[in-house]
Amino acid sequence: MDIIIRPTRKSDYNQLLEVEIAATPGLSYLPNVFDKFLHDITGHFLTAEVGGKVVGCGKFSMMIDGSAWLETLRVLPEFQGIGVGKAFYDEFLRL
């Protein structure tokens, strides 16, 4: 199963809301930060796909002191445990 990590697009919004609802029930964070994350030049807002299906998102930012901050990481429950989170981390480290 190939995991594709790519930049998030505005058109991913509805699918990523579904990811957030499934992955973190009762937490509504993404609607408040989606546009900010898309335009944040200090970080990377990425989306994971498996078989053409959006299965997760992650936001990684570099801090002034050189440290990094993983602001959010969401993966659909049925895709947890197959390496999606690791794929995000690997891509963040590459960036």
Which residues does each predicted region cover?
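N-terminal "mature head" segments of proteins
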Residues: 2, 45-47
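Conserved acetyl-CoA-binding loop-helix of GNAT-fold acetyltransferases
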Residues: 75-77, 81-95
